[in-house]
């Protein structure tokens, strides 16, 4: 009987093919398939995220920052777009990252950036800050006091500035920037003075550099804006004590000077979360009332050795964030190049689609946002 059924089925299929000869068969539209057959599936990434619980001590004062310094260049010159986890373009990327737990947008600003550094312009920063503020986000401006990005071993003065007048020029420049931001309706929530300073702010001696930072901090605070400093990570975490002491002495020199945040730039291949915990503990002990944050960090989701993944990126961010937070320190971090489409350590792939690691900022606050993606069963 089974053989008879197979024979009948074969004859029917052959007859159907014969009847359809000469007939053009139009393929189903991909969009039609997506609309009628696409199913929502819970991704492995979502399962991975559920193990991350709310961090004790996290709150409104915790800095959950994303650097968007490249945003204007990507949007206007490179015509990049940003998409959600389902690959659908979002109408407002600032509102979108806010929905994923980000509460602060940060931009870097150079004095006279040119060519490849043009993305660091004050004009770009104004536009990004205004968009971020409109989306209900806090904002941070990192003033580089250089014409390009600065690092621990490279604090190059802007063109036309001399070392002997650098402190005066820097304070004057700061006032000008704050005035321009105010006129543009882009006054930030906080200003970070310098980036990855390593005892060499404005190429001055250690003490003179700290004094210059303190004087600038007074200018910022006089404008009603919170201040932060960004330092290169010392070889030993406990060495942050020396920086704290020098800042304290320098701030005493200028009545009204002070700071709200002390930030350290972290590199995952060098600094562990245990290192960050020691930084936090030292700041708590030696600078009570000051908030220790990671002023810049980025973790790879892809590397040449094939060891990095979205899962490892997610874990690194959570561990670093947790290391900065306890009941005494609201902590937080600013994720560098967060907006960069296609970078191996950003939150958006080459197509602009968000990766689930972005959602760790929400999960760290106890909010389990939906990171499920659509899978087309025809593909």
Task: Please identify what each model-predicted range represents.
Residues 21-40:
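Sec-dependent signal peptide cleavage junction
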Residues 50, 54, 254, 286, ...:
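Aromatic-rich peripheral "rim/lid" segments of glycoside hydrolase catalytic domains that contact
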Residues 61-65, 103-106, 138-140, 187-192, ...:
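Structural preference for beta-strand elements that scaffold enzyme active sites
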Residues 1-11:
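Bacterial Sec-dependent N-terminal signal peptides
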Residues 12-24:
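Hydrophobic core
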Residues 69-71, 110-112, 144-146, 193-198, ...:
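Active-site beta-loop-alpha junctions enriched in small/polar residues
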Residues 121-124, 150-259, 268-288, 303-319, ...:
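Active-site cleft segment of glycoside hydrolase catalytic domains centered on the general acid/base Glu
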Residues 39-138, 144-169, 192, 263:
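N-terminal substrate-binding region of glycoside hydrolase catalytic domains
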């Amino acid at each position: 009987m089974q053989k008879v059924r197979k024979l009948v089925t074969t004859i029917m299929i052959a007859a159907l093919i014969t009847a359809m000869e000469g007939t053009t068969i139009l393929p189903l539209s991909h969009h039609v398939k997506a609309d009628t057959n696409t199913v929502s599936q819970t991704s492995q990434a979502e399962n991975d995220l559920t193990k991350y619980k709310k961090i004790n001590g996290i709150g409104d004062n915790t800095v959950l920052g994303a650097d968007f310094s490249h945003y204007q260049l990507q949007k206007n010159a490179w015509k990049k777009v940003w998409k959600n986890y389902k690959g659908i373009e979002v109408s407002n990327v600032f509102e979108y990252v806010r929905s994923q737990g980000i509460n602060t947008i940060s931009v870097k600003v150079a004095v006279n950036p040119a060519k490849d550094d043009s993305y660091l312009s004050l004009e770009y920063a104004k536009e990004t800050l205004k968009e971020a503020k409109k989306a209900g986000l806090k904002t941070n401006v990192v003033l580089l006091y250089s014409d390009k990005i600065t690092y621990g071993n490279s604090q190059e003065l802007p063109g036309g500035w001399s070392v002997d007048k650098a402190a005066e020029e820097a304070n004057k420049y700061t006032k000008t920037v704050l005035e321009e931001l105010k006129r543009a309706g882009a006054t930030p929530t906080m200003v970070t003075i310098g980036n990855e300073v390593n005892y060499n702010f404005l190429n001055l001696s250690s003490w003179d550099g700290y004094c210059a930072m303190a004087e600038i901090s007074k200018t910022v605070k006089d404008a009603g804006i919170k201040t932060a400093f960004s330092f290169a990570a010392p070889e030993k975490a406990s060495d942050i004590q020396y920086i704290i002491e020098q800042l304290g002495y320098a701030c005493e020199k200028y009545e009204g000077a002070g700071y709200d945040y002390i930030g350290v730039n972290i590199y995952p291949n060098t600094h562990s979360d245990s290192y960050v915990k020691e930084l936090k503990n030292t700041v708590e002990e030696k600078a009570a009332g000051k908030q220790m944050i990671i002023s810049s960090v980025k973790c790879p989701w892809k590397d040449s050795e094939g060891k990095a993944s979205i899962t490892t990126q997610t874990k690194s961010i959570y561990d670093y964030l947790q290391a900065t937070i306890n009941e005494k320190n609201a902590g937080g971090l600013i994720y560098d190049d967060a907006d960069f489409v296609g970078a191996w350590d950003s939150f958006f792939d080459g197509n602009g689609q968000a990766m689930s690691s972005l959602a760790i900022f929400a999960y760290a606050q106890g909010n389990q946002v939906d990171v499920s993606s659509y899978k087309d069963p025809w593909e």
